[in-house]
Amino acid sequence: MNFSKRIVLSALAGTVLATPAFAQDQSGETAADDNVIIVTAQRRAQDVQDIPLAVTAVSPVQLERQGVVSVTQIGQVSASFSSSNAQTAGGTNVLRIRGVGTTSNNIGFESAVGIFIDGAYQSRPGVALSEFVDVERLEVLRGPQGTLFGRNTSAGALNITTKRPDLNEFGGFVNATYGNYDNIGIQGAVNVPLIQDTLAARLTGAYRKRDGFVRVINETGEIGRTNELDQFLVRGQLGYESDGGVKVRLIFDYSEVNGNCCAPVEVLKSGLETGGVFAASGLGATGGQLVPAATTPNDTAGLNAALDGLTASQSLVQTSNLDQWGITGEIEFPLSDSADLIYIGSYRDFNSGNTGDSDFTTLDLFHVGNFDGGNRDIGTNIKTMTHELRVQGEAFDGKLDWLIGAYYSDEDIDSSGFSQLGTQWDQFVGALLQGSAGPAPIALFSGGLNPAGSNATNRFTQNSKSWSIFTHNTLEIVDGLKATIGLRYSDESKDGAFQQLNSNPGACGGIVNNVAGGPLAAGQPRIPGALVPTLLITGCFPFVAPADLAASAVLPLPRTFNGNFSDEELIYTGKLAYEFADPITIYGSFTHGYKSGGFNLDSTAAIGGADPRFASEEVDAYEIGLKAKFLDNAVTLNVAAFIEEFSNFQVLEFTGAQFQTFNVPKAESTGVEIESTIRPSENLTFNMALTYTDAKYPNDCATAADALRVQNLCGAALTNAPKYVAIGGATYRGDIGDSMRFFLNGQIRMESDRRTSTQPSTPPTTAAALGNTPLLPFDVQDGNIKINLRAGIGDIDDAWGIEAWVTNLTNEITRGVTFSTTLRGGSRSAFPQEPRMYGLTLRGKF
């Protein structure tokens, strides 16, 4: 379905639409303080309508209404936010704001959208995958936020605040959910005052288990499911407040996210399959892909049938396991009646691991994980420590709101992975060469060596240290006119290394000897020149090839590395805001933001002598906005227009055989955002949000001196950046007699077409081919509409409630990532997004 501007605007004009109430709703569904929404987007508690910043604030009620239980689902409540996921739960989540994010399957890449939970930075999206429960507020801060939030917020930030312990009242809640795919969820919290008005404890927990929605099959039938949930979280807090105003909050949490995640669905068949090459090579008619799919790039019916079938062909079911624990401490110490000292410190230990089939077929070709039973520590560990100290307050009778602070973080990454070739690898390479070199070309050209069992255990380490000093100050120059100046000096240093713990080279040595012109065994032929590239990359497959062979100096083979990256940057912002009527404010701002560079932590990073480092990303952002309320605060309207210009934009792409990192000299995002809430009565609320975003690589994004893969991006839209997104819905609530109440809620989310791959077309091999290479098939996800509905009934005091709900009512199957299937000659595969979900939720409060 293709959407144009006219279609989106017509739909908005013709239908009363609404997004979630952007934190308008409070406990018990009643508005408070004339709909004042308090946020901490500027590190102070402020009315969201008073700050010169584009921010969407979402209440816990609205998160529940739209079924948002993790950061990956925030796009359901924010039109400017999106996320996508690929093969693993912990390492391939990509978050985007205004179409900008860091596409990555690499632990060395850091997100362009920073995540902060209770003021503490979460270093990777995978670290923040635990369930949303007992949340006080979610803030989506749009645009670069580096002045106050620091590192890696070049696209924006998520500021998540959990509920604090209540020093006075005992209470809590319990929620229980059951839905399709055997979706079982339990959430709860209990608050216990230990010393009245002084000390309290709060314990929060959540458990969720759901079957996967993608079937995994081989020749024997279904062998499992992926895209499942199996997770739990426990969080304990202590809150303290002295008579003198000293406040202390200590938070400990532990969580696990397990299950099978995630399997791609083949959407376009390889020409080797449709041409009968796999069959002729003894690999079966389909070459290990058992599910019908499109046979040509124009076969949209085949594409849709493949996606709707939600079935993947694999020899193993992908598994992912995450566990982490962390501690956060916050101290607020009053220095005077107008100044406070605030400290936030955190420590987090995160572990993840995954095993699975990386060729995405039922053939025995290529796997990752500890399959050999060896005593190797396989997986990723990230230890992160952060400290932030701020002094802030007011001066000149409240005319000046000032803040100064310092920040330090220390992070250690230790990531090891085991990869191995399977028994059918050589036969598969023979099919890739369409029989021109016989049924087992690697054995032929390596002197009889079998590549089956070739494996390597690769280890990547990185230590990152960052420190900064910052200030953020707002001065009311005259009544209604405020100026804000923010500065942050940031210093980053990283030590990154790749070492190979173990390697079984298999046939690689024989292939290298052949290519390098070494002596041949009796009957061993020399590799023809035309076949050298294919035989080298398949005989020495980069993920299993031995590192630092003598031939690595001249051939594209893995090399270990041990290096240093350092950078410093001055981040700054300037804003002017004018309140020309009590509820109406206009503002303009400029912000210079920054995201640190670092290391491509991958075995292919230094192939051919390449520099494994990538440069820091910078952004200059311009924004003007309007924040207004009308009709006795019954109508809220917020509008923002923005231009964001990126330099050294960080990109990672998978070529089908290796991961490549590079910086694109230019990228940009421009657009307009509109959010509005209308309350015609106490019982009825309408909200709407519309985002227009033109996020792209400009036509002059690179020069002739840049690599062809960089030049090829010029003129293309950024990945997963639809031009139009509209979210809307309505909520009606009413009483049933004197003891019960009910509500009805509906939401619709529409988006226009979006690209789902890094490259828009087949990467050119020569400069002359730029602009003439064919578009990659099925790169574009068509525009779509998704509808959520929820209805509930319960006690008027919220003592109990029952709700029925459905998300993605029409079962619209979309895809977040589309890629060229590993070494499969033109095949394309995609990771499908969540289908229709429905169920019942019971709520109790005490």
What is the meaning of each model-derived region?
Residues 159, 168-169, 175-177, 189, ...:
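Periplasmic-side early beta-strands and strand-to-turn transitions of outer-membrane beta-barrels
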Residues 748-767, 793-846:
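C-terminal beta-signal and adjacent terminal beta-strands/loops
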Residues 330-334, 340-346, 351-358, 579-602, ...:
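Membrane-embedded beta-barrel scaffold of Gram-negative outer-membrane proteins
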Residues 27-28, 399, 405, 479, ...:
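Gram-negative outer-membrane beta-barrel transporters
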Residues 239-241, 405-409, 460-644:
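Structural signature of Gram-negative outer-membrane beta-barrels, strongest in the C-terminal barrel
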Residues 110-112, 124, 133-142, 147-234, ...:
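Outer-membrane beta-barrel translocator/receptor signature
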Residues 33-167, 624:
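Acidic, small-polar-rich N-terminal luminal/periplasmic segments of exported/outer-membrane proteins
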Residues 1-66, 72-76, 234, 245, ...:
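N-terminal Sec signal peptide and the immediately downstream disordered periplasmic leader
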